[in-house]
Every structure is written in structure tokens, then in C-alpha cells.
Swiss-Prot record:
Name assigned to this protein: Small ribosomal subunit protein uS12
Function in brief: With S4 and S5 plays an important role in translational accuracy. Interacts with and stabilizes bases of the 16S rRNA that are involved in tRNA selection in the A site and with the mRNA backbone. Located at the interface of the 30S and 50S subunits, it traverses the body of the 30S subunit contacting proteins on the other side and probably holding the rRNA structure together. The combined cluster of proteins S8, S12 and S17 appears to hold together the shoulder and platform of the 30S subunit.
Segments of this protein annotated with the region Disordered: 1-23
Assigned keywords, A-Z: Methylation, Ribonucleoprotein, Ribosomal protein, RNA-binding, rRNA-binding, tRNA-binding
A Pfam family recorded for this sequence: Ribosom_S12_S23
PROSITE patterns, A to Z: RIBOSOMAL_S12
HAMAP family reported for this sequence: Ribosomal_uS12_B
Top-level taxonomic group: Bacteria
């Protein structure tokens, strides 16, 4: 236990919590340009070809972003919007691509959870 005199000389410092998505710099979303669009395999015990994109953000950061949903139209030089949110079985992927914003098209023929995939309401 510190004495009052010690605390007067050197007060207690509060712990600084580290952000899980530092590249966003306290913004809800960030715009960026795809530098590479590719597939990668998840950690054990899962097996798939997950679609990801390497993105150069407007603030200079280069991050990896997951592309959710079935099928996408992204390629190199596509301008996309990313949000926070990691993918548990892909190490180093801490961002999600926002579907239906900028150059990234929404998922076609999506019926449920449409707002998460940028899909308009179907007719009928």
C-alpha cells in the first residue's frame, strides 16, 4: 500500500485499454481501396475457402477485411467500406466489408437478414 505522501508525489495511473480495431481510429466505418482479393482457409477444426480482401484505408492503414455472404463482385482497386468485427476462425482478420455500400454489391436473392447484406426488399 502506498503512503499518502507517495501518492501526492506520483498519483496512480489508470490502465489504458487497447482497441481491438485500432485502424478505424474511433470511426464507425472507414473507406478503403482493395489491394488484393483472395481466399484463405480457417483454423482447425473448420474447413472452407473464406473470401477476404486486403484493404488500404484512407488513413494509411493496410488491413484484412472479411467479405460476408454468398458471392461478391470485388476485385483489385474496388472502393469499399469496412466496419469492425473480427472473424474468429481467421487469424488477423478483424474487419468486415459492408455489403451494398460503395463498389461492393449486396447479396443477390437474399431473403432473411437482408439489412446485414445490403439487399433490397423482394417484390411480392
Amino acid at each position: 500500500m502506498a503512503t499518502i505522501n507517495q501518492l501526492v508525489r506520483k498519483p496512480r495511473r489508470s490502465k489504458v485499454t487497447k482497441s481491438n480495431s485500432a485502424a478505424l481510429k474511433a470511426c464507425p466505418q472507414k473507406r478503403g481501396v482493395c489491394t488484393r482479393v483472395y481466399t484463405t482457409t480457417p483454423k482447425k477444426p473448420n474447413s472452407a475457402l473464406r473470401k477476404v480482401a486486403r484493404v488500404r484505408l484512407t488513413n494509411g492503414f493496410e488491413v484484412t477485411s472479411y467479405i460476408g455472404g454468398e458471392g461478391h463482385n470485388l476485385q483489385e482497386h474496388s472502393v469499399i467500406l469496412i466496419r469492425g468485427g473480427r472473424v474468429k476462425d481467421l487469424p488477423g482478420v478483424r474487419f468486415h466489408t459492408v455489403r451494398g455500400a460503395l463498389d461492393c454489391a449486396g447479396v443477390s436473392d437474399r431473403r432473411q437478414a437482408r439489412s446485414k447484406y445490403g439487399t433490397k426488399r423482394p417484390k411480392g
